[in-house]
Amino acid sequence: MSDGEEDQTAIVCDNGSGLVKSGFAGDDAPRAVFPSTVGRPRHQGVMVGMGQKDSYVGDEAQSKRGILTLKYPIEHGIITNWDDMEKIWHHTFYNELRVAPEEHPTLLTEAPLNPKANREKMTQIMFETFNVPAMYVAIQAVLSLYASGRTTGIVLDSGDGVSHNVPIYEGYALPHAIARLDLAGRDLTDYLMKILTERGYSFVTTAEREIVRDIKEKLCYVALDFEQEMATAASSTSLEKSYELPDGQVITIGNERFRCPETLFQPSFIGMESAGIHETTYNSIMKCDIDIRKDLYANNVLSGGSTMYPGIADRMQKEITALAPSTMKIKIIAPPERKYSVWIGGSILASLSTFQQMWITKQEYDEAGPSIVHRKCF
């Protein structure tokens, strides 16, 4: 690092499918958290001099969502629209953090088992468009484990676009046992939109989907026993809650509150053939060496926004206990700040002195090209 230690602070940017979390290494929380959306007007502007733009990013897109079509450039953890992604990064550096990217090493995050081209293109844009001096791409779940202060454990990271299980032993990720499930928060929002329609509330536009996401975040929970909860909901109104829509209309939601996140445990609800998150966790542990399974069972770390439902830790405990050997000690770790634990782990990693030789420098990139990212990043 140069003399200007302060100027060279690394930037940590966890670009999730739903939210971008960004800030400076060494901080204990991200400075900027905003939706990874780009909105474009769906109407013709008529007021001259309003300074209307052809696109809006993040919170501004959210606040004007009534007149915009919102698009998320990251789907299931994979960047599908690079032009919009560039807008989001530009917004992150210049508007949210107010820094010049050419002065700061930048740590980005990625879901495991992503297409290789995805991280190559990320590397290319960082060096060629934003001229960063150095960068690194880290696996999200590994960072969550850092944040929990462990070196061994199995992380279930579930965000808006993708859920994955990554077993890590003494700091080494075990790639053969990584499980990825393309079922996460956005699918739950879509499912909630669908089951609310059955109740007679229609939500269709991209803006209305954001309202449903808010309902999901405020009112949904995971039932400990799904069948029993369904029976309770059918026989009484004790589980019903009301929600006021932006136009003042009040809607009531009952068993939808737990039917929505139940999809994580029963993906067949949305027509997916996959096993639920409890089973993928168990299968992932079973793919690991018999000697380390005990340590993994005792360190089940939850991370990401879709693990924030009340009741999810107890339910995981119950489901994994049912699958595991009867004498096994099973512990689910659900840190309160798990929504941001990927970012926090990145902040810890990027400020370690031992990490400084891991950065991909501009010079290395110029010599080897984008494929350098596979050699230097796990």
Curated annotation (Swiss-Prot):
It comes from Halocynthia roretzi (Sea squirt). Signal peptide: none annotated. It catalyses: ATP + H2O = ADP + phosphate + H(+). Keywords: ATP-binding, Cytoplasm, Cytoskeleton, Hydrolase, Muscle protein, Nucleotide-binding. GO terms for molecular function: ATP binding; hydrolase activity. SMART domains: ACTIN. This is Actin, muscle 1A. InterPro entries: Actin, Actin/actin-like_CS, Actin_CS, ATPase_NBD. Coiled coil: none annotated. It comes from the Eukaryota. GO terms for cellular component: cytoplasm; cytoskeleton. Actins are highly conserved proteins that are involved in various types of cell motility and are ubiquitously expressed in all eukaryotic cells. Multiple isoforms are involved in various cellular functions such as cytoskeleton structure, cell mobility, chromosome movement and muscle contraction. The keyword Hydrolase applies. Its main location: cytoplasm. Belongs to the actin family. It is found in: Cytoplasm, Cytoskeleton. Its EC number is 3.6.4.-. The keyword Transmembrane does not apply. It holds the Pfam family Actin.
